[in-house]
Amino acid sequence: MNTQFKLIGFDLDGTLVNSLPDLALSVNSALAEFNLPKAPEELVLTWIGNGAPVLIARALDWAKKQTGKVLTETEVKQVTERFNFYYGENLCNVSRLYPNVKETLETLKEKGYVLAVVTNKPTRHVQPVLAAFGIDHLFSEMLGGQSLPAIKPHPAPLYYLCGKFGFEPRQVLFVGDSKNDIIAAHAAGCAVVGLTYGYNYNIPITESNPDWVFDDFAQLLTIL
């Protein structure tokens, strides 16, 4: 066990789980109800990372450019609600854990690290997704988009973990795939690993200057 770090926090989408196919399906199902075009999966990928409301706002902005159709504030809220409905029904139809995630998490847990999830994903979806892959029991805390007043890239979730478990920021390592993860960790004073395989708006994670850059989740064991 690395004696510097006591707690390891993880992003969810694009870090632990490849959820893009189910997210894209749910976005397009919601758009279709309002006679809006279907977005390519590779485009939906660039919209992920700031929570459901921002995801839908980006989708509607794209749809507006395609069709010229502008939705009312009420309709925008309805699209978001329909997205949440469809995603709730399709959390893990085709989503998959990334390679070596479960085994690596189990090893870290056995080594004595406190594990936590910090995601901007709607809070009500977090535990069900983790449970679907049989890894929810490995985490001592699971924070979603509605768990706290602020979400990443704000450092509040990491400060919360420090306070709850009694650790200093230097004792926390965060692992994510997006610039939001790197910014939040740096702002909180935590070390951070950037993963290259996730959803960072098609921007290389190296540009956000994480402390380590890994291509494979199992590489965490080289520093822990």
Swiss-Prot record:
It catalyses: 2-phosphoglycolate + H2O = glycolate + phosphate. It comes from the Bacteria. One of its GO terms (molecular function) is metal ion binding. Its EC number is 3.1.3.18. Its cofactor is Mg(2+). It is an enzyme of class 3 (hydrolase). GO terms for cellular component: cytosol. Signal peptide: none annotated. Keywords: Carbohydrate metabolism, Hydrolase, Magnesium, Metal-binding. Belongs to the HAD-like hydrolase superfamily. CbbY/CbbZ/Gph/YieH family. This is Phosphoglycolate phosphatase. It comes from Haemophilus influenzae (strain 86-028NP).
